[in-house]
Structure formats: C-alpha cells, structure tokens
Amino acid sequence: MALAKRIIPCLDVDNGRVVKGVKFENIRDAGDPVEIARRYNEQGADEITFLDITASVDGRDTTLHTVERMASQVFIPLTVGGGVRTVQDIRNLLNAGADKVSINTAAVFNPEFVGEAADRFGSQCIVVAIDAKKVSGPGETPRWEIFTHGGRKPTGLDAVEWAKKMEGLGAGEILLTSMDQDGMKNGFDLGVTRAISDALGIPVIASGGVGNLQHLADGILEGHASAVLAASIFHFGEYTVPEAKAYMASRGIVVR
C-alpha cells in the first residue's frame, strides 16, 4: 500500500511571531505561533514545522518557551529548527516537546554533527534542512547550490550530492527549500525536488513557492516528494488543510 503523503504547515517565527517573507525578505506578520499551530492541529495537518528564522543569523537559541507552549497544544508531530548547533540544543528542544529537530547551517560547518545527533537520538528525529538555489544557466546541466544563514551565504556545495551525504550520515529526512521560489507562490522548483527525491531513500519534504493546491499535488506527483510544506496559503486563509487534502486525494494521492 502506498504511504500517505503528508501536508505540513510551516511557521516561520521571528521574535515570537509567525511571519512570511518573499525569497527570505520583505517580512509580514501572520500572528501568534501557538494559536496558529492549534488551528492547524484542529484542521488535521499531518505535522507542523516551526522554524526560528532569526536564530542562525543572530546566533540566538530557538525559543524553548514557545516550543513548550506549542507542544502542550498540538498533538501531531512537531519539527523545530533554527540555530541548532549542539547535541545539547537538540536535547533541549526534544525535552521541550519537539518530535524532530531540523539542522541547517550547523550541518554545513560540521557534517559529523548530523551523524553524532543521529547516533544519539535516532535518525527518525533528525531532519536536515537544505536551502538550495539554482546556479546553472540556460542550456547547462541543472545544478543547485546550498546556501546557509537564512539563505544569505553561498557554500559552493552541490545540493544533490550534499543531500546524499546527509542521508549517509544518518539524517532521517530532508527539508528542501528552493530559495528561487520561496514566497513567490508560483510552485515548487520541481527540478531540484525531483533530483533530490530520486537520489535518496529517505523522505524529502518540498518547500518554497506554494501558491495554490495544484502546486502541492505537483510536489508529490512531479517532484516525487514524500511531503509538502506550505506557509502563506494556510496562514492568510486562502486554503485550509482539509481543502488541500481533498484536492490531493482528487489527484489520486494517498493522504491521511
């Protein structure tokens, strides 16, 4: 039987408020994270992802207090990321109520940290977040590069090869954001989504660019992702999670 595909609302949190930007800039406020998470829990979201988008840039630790409040209200898996640099950071987040922890910038500077985290806590709770940007020109073989620090710093790392390396070190899941598409609302970058999904044996979550329900289905059917993540289409009331599930089911996708 086909595994159900997951729909994951994403909360980008900046100083305790949910925000949404375009290509990682031009931020607008979307509300209180705990209230928003509770709404998605009631709507039947499969999981929730909470990313403290200020953490890596400012060197701040993810807001444990907000995670604790959220975990007390939300009874679906909660992935938390942002500024995760040490095993103790992961332990603190899991103790606060996170089910999975997302590692981004720290994985690039110290790949062995991913292996250490997977050994300590189990691959099932270690997510590696990849922010990728297309760097190949027209007519060239498609190539995507990893960026860090909230999409500000290029690394020179090839996104597909990097994702394979992370799987080898023990990551249980890849959260893949296309920086070219983020907040643009014209669909996922299906090229990089498919390239990484097809190269790996672990689930890939597609992120960055959802503007309508067709985009969610395309991420699964054309991007071969295991799960799709969206923010603004849910936060600002354009669509609900049940509407998204009904549409995906109508396209022949197995949903919970």
Swiss-Prot record:
Transmembrane segments: none annotated. Pathway: Amino-acid biosynthesis; L-histidine biosynthesis; L-histidine from 5-phospho-alpha-D-ribose 1-diphosphate: step 5/9. It is found in: Cytoplasm. It catalyses: 5-[(5-phospho-1-deoxy-D-ribulos-1-ylimino)methylamino]-1-(5-phospho-beta-D-ribosyl)imidazole-4-carboxamide + L-glutamine = D-erythro-1-(imidazol-4-yl)glycerol 3-phosphate + 5-amino-1-(5-phospho-beta-D-ribosyl)imidazole-4-carboxamide + L-glutamate + H(+). Its EC number is 4.3.2.10. It is an enzyme of class 4 (lyase). GO terms for biological process: L-histidine biosynthetic process. The active site is at D12, D131. HAMAP family: HisF. Belongs to the HisA/HisF family. Heterodimer of HisH and HisF. IGPS catalyzes the conversion of PRFAR and glutamine to IGP, AICAR and glutamate. The HisF subunit catalyzes the cyclization activity that produces IGP and AICAR from PRFAR using the ammonia provided by the HisH subunit. This is Imidazole glycerol phosphate synthase subunit HisF. It comes from Pseudomonas putida (strain GB-1). The lineage of its organism: Bacteria, Pseudomonadati, Pseudomonadota, Gammaproteobacteria, Pseudomonadales.
